[in-house]
């Protein structure tokens, strides 16, 4: 089931990923719980995830906050298997023709973007596009193995 979230426009100049948390705080943009759990039978574990977003007319500002029992980010480079890591996912459909963008980013900011009408056969964004997306993670940007113990981390794009 698709959820719709209105994304507020804020008056701000270009924002770096490292400043997104502060900018969204100053604009009083609150977090919204992510309560859509895909593939629940196959993957019953469900971390707590919240997201908040805004735009300035040129940039979409995204801030995830995740609490989970173990954090992992081993995908070594963009366009890798980030879905096997602690990962945040966003589906955007800017036009009503059935196509959508799927953005997946792990806890270290490693990114995968696909575009298409269904899960299979989506066209992946080239590295030249991925390089234009600034990223910040409270876990740092270097891949890492499992870190056990409940913790909360944030990711900004």
Which role does the model predict for each range below?
Residues 1-157:
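Structural preference for beta-rich elements and adjacent junctions enriched in aromatics
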């Amino acid at each position: 089931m698709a959820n719709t979230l209105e994304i507020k426009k804020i008056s701000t100049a270009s924002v770096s990923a490292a400043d997104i948390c502060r900018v969204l705080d100053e604009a009083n943009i609150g977090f919204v719980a992510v309560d859509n759990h895909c593939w629940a039978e196959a993957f019953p574990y469900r971390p707590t995830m919240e997201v908040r977003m805004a735009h300035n007319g040129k940039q979409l500002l995204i801030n995830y906050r995740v609490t989970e029992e173990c954090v992992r980010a081993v995908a070594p480079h963009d366009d890798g298997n980030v879905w096997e890591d602690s990962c945040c996912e966003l589906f955007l459909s800017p036009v009503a023709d059935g196509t959508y963008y799927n953005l997946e980013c792990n806890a270290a900011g490693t990114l995968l973007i696909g575009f298409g009408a269904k899960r299979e056969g989506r066209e992946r964004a080239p590295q030249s596009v991925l390089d234009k997306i600034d990223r910040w993670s409270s876990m740092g940007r270097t891949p890492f193995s499992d870190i056990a113990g409940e913790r909360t981390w944030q990711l900004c794009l």
